[in-house]
Amino acid sequence: CADHFQITPQNLAQHITAKSKAILLNSPNNPTGAVYTPESLDAVYQVAKEKNLFVLCDNVYAQLVYGPYQSFSRYQDIREKIILIQSFSKPYAMTGWRMGYLCADRPVIEQLAKLHSYTVVSAVSFLQKGCAAALDYDPSPMVETYRRRRDYVYGRLVEMGMEVQKPQGAFYLFPSIQKYGMDSE
């Protein structure tokens, strides 16, 4: 991908309309593994601030990065418009447990709590205990294993002549199939 799956002011602007209420920011990205650069984050920040949009930051792969990573939470002047979403399943290998949390300004949390009370009764106790224990776990050995696997698969794809962006996070590789006359449809 020419832009390395980064967000540019131009490609973001063409997708924002008068009906837009929020931007969903997924970094590291699923399925590309791209980690957004400070320039990409700045582009989102400028548009969100100018258009008074919420930014939902899907950070479920934030602990699974292979280099520099910056959280969107650094933009404190729009703090009331930022919702950080985190999961236990990806960083702690608890796939299928469907347990997570979010961080947001108090008025946002109060509104989300109302919604939550009508959609979820409670998390089962063993999930709560497992997630609490996971917070004491250091995921860096798992991240190093993912890095080795990423490097191996990436290297093999490149050796086979595939065009693929080396993922900066998560555990996905997203090869291009365009040169084979195929598209994603």
Enumerate the predicted regions with their spans.
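PLP-dependent class I/II
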Residues: 1-185
